[in-house]
Amino acid sequence: MGQEKHVFTIDWAGRQLTVEAGQLAKQANGAVMVRYGDTAVLSTATASKEPKPLDFFPLTVNYEERLYAVGKIPGGFIKREGRPSEKAVLASRLIDRPIRPLFADGFRNEVQVISIVMSVDQDCSSEMAAMFGSSLALCVSDIPFEGPIAGVTVGRIDGKFVINPTVDQLEKSDINLIVAGTKDAINMVEAGADEVPEEIMLEAIMFGHEEIKRLIAFQEEIVAAVGKEKTEIELYEIDEELSEKVKSLAEPDLLSAIQVHEKHAREDAINEVKNAVVAKFEEEEHDEDTIKKVKQTLSKLVKNEVRRLITEEKVRPDGRGVDQIRPLSSEVGLLPRTHGSGLFTRGQTQALSVCTLGALGDVQILDGLGVEESKRFMHHYNFPQFSVGETGPMRGPGRREIGHGALGERALEPVIPNEKDFPYTVRLVSEVLESNGSTSQASICASTLAMMDAGVPIKAPVAGIAMGLVKSGEYYTVLTDIQGMEDALGDMDFKVAGTEKGVTALQMDIKIEGLSREILEEALQQAKKGRMEILNSMLSTLGESRKELSQYAPKILTMNINPDKIRDVIGPSGKQINKIIEDTGVKIDIEQDGTIFISSTDESSNQKAKKIIEDLVREVEVGQLYLGKVKRIEKFGAFVEIFSGKDGLVHISELALERVGKVEDVVKIGDEILVKVTEIDKQGRVNLSRKAVLREEKEKEQEQQQS
């Protein structure tokens, strides 16, 4: 079989984007190699030939990192890649979210989209290349897909927007926005920002969309040249006659059940109606397939009725107005031995966050494809089953937990004080205790309170809120503070976090093809109003960060030494620094510029370690007097330690004013004597004199007697 390779090229933000099709992974339904600068990503799309007997679309998106892409060999004994890194999980979610809405309702064939990162140029995003490649692999395949989509990164430097900023440019940018969409609309947003106003964030999104249109035109050109004909598939549909029968049996009672305000009572009421309808069909002895379709019809009926109530009557399941927030409450200082804790409750959503402060040596070490080697601020999110009143296995964090944790981290990072002002590692853990929607945003609010309780001098408090949307034709309703049912049955989950001044994080997922500028603008403004209300509630609990850290938090002492003296502090094979740590019980972190951070829960231990280090790096000055201790005696003189780690020789002729026959006649080991530095020779050896000190003292006495 021949290997006909088709190559397509375009300029993308000043760097070359090349697509190769037809040579690699030809047994997949669709495959492309995307080269962006020196970044290379192989993206493939594969689908099962038959639909799966499921009531959801089985799509899997994987972004696979290979350390060979940056010339690294994995650490550990196994020497191969293990479980995906946090960055890989987030990238998989990033690609999944814009492509998922573009498969037809009722499509049940299993689809797997895999992107393998094979080479990384740090200034050419492998995530953006993988998103482009994933869309294109689906488009050139025979898998039914209503794309293409594309995504870009948008930065803002000195007030000007930049597409796909380099690593250096991102350092100067106050926005790090990833936006994806079709040629007609936006369908995914992920952003971090330094308290940027909503209006500017909206302009950044629309700026990114213009570049997306160009990338989609490029994909359409490639599809026209090498794309396969799409497979005809049979979509899963429910018989209309059955639907009408189910509707007639359920509708009267379902409407009132949907409008029960309390979550569990509402679920019970809806289930009661569903069970009654299913029971009637079971009495008529219908087969299992029909019963399954009845249950699916009932679920669809609930969805349609909730959406109708919201769009036509502006009525929400719990009775709130469209822009009304659920009851708010918060509390701090719940856990006495932790460094800081905050509890935030919004309706039936509740999060408890705990702040832990550590030394700079406690940073998280990153071993991935990026340039970042460590991070000193972390936010971890846990979602136990009891938060929704269910049982289930206790597993490690999944994609959702990692994604929500990262969103909170992004929202809070802009307000974390820098290392110079606050030399601590900060770890936040958010425990979701109750869930009825917007738990990620509740964790942001609780984390802000926990840091303030811990005494972290944050630049400003941060609050988060989740906005929803129900769209029917040209009509739509934007919802403030969506609960679980509105999230599940609505068209959008738009999370906005920020301070009083502006936005620090955005995340938008939708289930429809895209959103217009008008809807985005309305959602952002409505979110701002809600965020201010939440911030006011939080600040009524704790108005500002505590002035003092917890007594259980480590105390950190900072000192600076000459960088050339770092080796003296560390010692051969770390012997010296390990001895200091062992003797004082502190942690010591040394920067290359000579900054030293000493930490422990005991301030006196810090001071003790500081004194030892000061003595180690102290420079001996000729002519200076020192009170030293005799450490060793030889025939020719006495060795005196003038400060920790520094000895000098007092020759026998320099011990006294008169002639000395034997060193032991004047000093013994352990004696403290005042000596003067007379010389430091070329080999760094220090010569001391007691005679010089005695002579000076005698001369002073004579002067005083004469006067």
Swiss-Prot record:
The keyword Lipid biosynthesis appears for this protein: no
EC number, UniProt record: 2.7.7.8
Describe its function.
Involved in mRNA degradation. Catalyzes the phosphorolysis of single-stranded polyribonucleotides processively in the 3'- to 5'-direction.
Per its record, the protein catalyses: RNA(n+1) + phosphate = RNA(n) + a ribonucleoside 5'-diphosphate
Tell me which Gene Ontology terms the entry assigns under biological process: mRNA catabolic process; RNA processing
Give the originating organism.
Bacillus velezensis (strain DSM 23117 / BGSC 10A6 / LMG 26770 / FZB42)
| Record flagged with keyword Nucleotidyltransferase | yes
Report which gene this protein is encoded by: pnp
Family classification: Belongs to the polyribonucleotide nucleotidyltransferase family.
Q: What name goes with this protein?
A: Polyribonucleotide nucleotidyltransferase
